[in-house]
Design a protein with these regions (language model features):
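Hydrophobic membrane-insertion alpha-helices, especially the h-region
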Residues: 11-30
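Non-cytosolic head/periplasmic domains of membrane-anchored proteins
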Residues: 88-175
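Exposed beta-strand and adjacent loop surfaces of beta-rich binding modules
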Residues: 36-38, 71-73, 124
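Tryptophan-anchored aromatic micro-motifs
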Residues: 33-52
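A short linear-motif detector with a strong N-terminal bias
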Residues: 15-20, 35-37, 53-55
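N-terminal Lys/Arg-rich, disordered targeting/topogenic segments
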Residues: 1-9
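Extracytoplasmic/periplasmic/luminal assembly and interaction segments
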Residues: 49, 53-104
Length: 175
């Protein structure tokens, strides 16, 4: 083997190693997305036809990972729900669902407000609001947007649950 060929192979191996390191590094870096939106939304229950118009503001950064759980740093506020105007610690998403815990007095976490399933770009969401007994697919309060009426909210909630939280398939179907 000539000296020139050895040098080319050495250069090629170094370049391949650098590319491999860069690819591995890129796989573990997040893809951050700024989200600054206010959506019209509908608060509704699966057990009746009642619905209440509201709005939800998302303001923060969504960190989308390839091999880790995604998370959101920022604020999610719902008009008509004063408990959501408090600080919101980082929301980590497991299988597409995140839990909303707001901070109360002296920085202590209050009981869980609910869960959220957003689209990663923040263009749509559904929130299940917990009460003192938790949340039920049959009678629990949901807030879904963007939606202008109950029908749109139910359709969007079903779509989000099935797409971003696959374990819901066949378990929860909103009507």
């Amino acid at each position: 083997m000539t000296e020139k060929r050895k040098q080319r192979m050495k250069t090629r191996n170094v370049i391949l190693l650098l590319l491999l390191i860069a690819a591995a590094y890129a796989c573990f870096l997040p893809l951050p997305r700024s989200i600054h939106v206010t959506h019209s939304a509908v608060a509704w229950r699966n057990c009746d036809d009642a619905n209440t118009p509201t709005s939800v503001t998302m303001d923060g950064i969504y960190f989308d990972y390839l091999f880790r759980e995604d998370y959101f740093d920022g604020a999610i506020t719902v008009s008509g729900f004063p408990e959501t105007f408090k600080p919101l610690p980082r929301v980590t998403f497991h299988d597409g669902m995140g839990m909303l815990f707001y901070q109360g007095e002296q920085g202590l976490l209050e009981p869980m407000f609910g869960w959220i399933i957003p689209s990663p770009e923040g263009s749509a969401f559904t929130i299940g609001v917990h009460n003192e007994h938790g949340w039920s697919a049959d009678t629990g309060l949901n807030i879904t947007g963007p939606a202008d009426n109950r029908y749109e909210a139910v359709q969007l909630a079903n779509k989000l649950c099935q797409r971003y939280h696959p374990s819901f398939l066949g378990t929860w179907t909103f009507e």
